[in-house]
Structures are given as C-alpha cells and as structure tokens.
C-alpha cells in the first residue's frame, strides 16, 4: 500500500503505528494502524478493537479494504461519513522554467517566505492553515524536519505549501489558501517554490 503517511510511520520518522492486542494481551501483528496528523490508515485483518482506539478529535480513517470500511462504519454508526480521498499522481518530472516563471509573476503585494518559527506560530493560530505544520509533534520537530513556504500579505499568511509528512524518499505536501485569497494562483506559486 503506497501511502506516504504509512512510510513516515514505518520508517519511524513521524507518526505512530498501532497493533491490536490478542486475547492474551500480546501484540496481534495481523492488524495495524498508521496514525499521523488527522489520518489513520488501517491494514491487515479488520479489527474492531483497533478502530476503537482512535485518538480524540477529528480523524480521517482510511480503510485498506471494504472489510475495514465495514468495521469502521459499524463502530461509528451515525457519526462517521464516507468520503472519497483522491490520490495525486506521484510525478517527479517538473518543468523548472515554468515553476520559476510562476514564482516571478507573484504580484508585489504578496511576499513569499520560508516557514520560520514566527510563521509556524501564525500557521498554528488559524484553523485554515494549521495543517501546514500540525502533523509534526512540536514546533522544534517542524523546524528540524519540516519544509514549507507561505505567502504573506500585510504580514498575514494567506497561502502555504508545506510537508504534511516526511519520509526518507520524499514528503507529502499540504497546500492551503485562506478563503478570501483563493483563485489567484497563490497555492500554485507556493508549490512551485517548495518544489
């Protein structure tokens, strides 16, 4: 199952792995969950007990199979809703000149900046931008391992692209733009700079 969040957990870079306990209190390696940020991926033999160990708050549960999906629905009758998560093609061919041109065309009222400690705090402060950095366990962890850029306008973050998760061979990117600044290609500029 090729998912960057799972790679992050398996490689012990970030996130956590959970296994179900068997009837004797030992680990049951037939069922596992990878948990990072808002996501929890389930694999192996479907296990109700593992699903019920979800962290507090909002969680996007990703089943590997229809059997896992059924267990999740049964555990959270009336409170869970099914959505479709679209995977992006993992293409590593970029047109460098086009990316540079996009960055150069950013209007003057905007400023493109790498995420530093002050901008990290600003990302965390707003719900729309929190996921740019919140996958990391702390500010120190983001500063050490994270990679991201934001666009500011009048000192406030209006768009950003950042590593939601990292693993040895790459990153999964989180991209967000404040609602009143959307449809201006700001997210594309952030992505171009991050790449």
PLM features per residue range, with description:
Residues 2-14, 127-148:
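Active-site rim helix/loop that mediates acceptor-substrate recognition in acyltransferases
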Residues 5-8, 12-118:
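Acyl-donor-binding surface of acyltransferase catalytic domains
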Residues 40-43, 170-172, 184-186:
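A short, polar/proline- and glycine-enriched secondary-structure boundary/capping micro-motif
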Residues 101, 135-138, 192:
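Tryptophan-centric aromatic hotspots in well-structured domains and transmembrane helices
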Residues 114-134:
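Helix-loop element at the rim of GNAT/NAT acetyltransferase active sites that forms part
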Residues 138-178:
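A conserved beta-strand-loop-helix scaffold within acyl/acetyltransferase catalytic domains
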Residues 183-195:
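Conserved acetyl-CoA-binding loop-helix of GNAT-fold acetyltransferases
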């Amino acid at each position: 199952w090729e998912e960057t969040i799972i790679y992050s957990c398996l490689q012990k870079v970030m996130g956590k792995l959970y296994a179900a306990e068997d009837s004797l209190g030992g680990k049951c390696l037939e069922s596992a969950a990878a948990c990072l940020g808002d996501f929890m991926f389930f694999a192996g033999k479907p296990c109700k007990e593992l699903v019920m160990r979800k962290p507090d708050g909002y969680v996007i549960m990703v089943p590997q199979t229809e059997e896992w999906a059924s267990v999740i629905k049964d555990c959270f009758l009336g409170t869970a809703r099914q959505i479709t998560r679209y995977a992006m093609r993992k293409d590593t061919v970029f047109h460098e000149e086009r990316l540079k041109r996009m960055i150069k065309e950013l209007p003057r009222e905007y400023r493109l900046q790498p995420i530093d400690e002050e901008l990290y705090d600003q990302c965390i402060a707003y719900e729309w931008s929190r996921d740019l950095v919140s996958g990391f366990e702390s500010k120190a962890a983001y500063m050490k391992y994270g990679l991201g850029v934001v666009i500011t306008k009048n000192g406030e973050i209006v768009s950003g692209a950042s590593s939601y998760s990292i693993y040895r061979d790459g990153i999964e990117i989180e991209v967000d733009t404040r609602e009143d600044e959307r449809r201006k290609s700001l997210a594309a500029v952030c992505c171009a700079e991050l790449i």
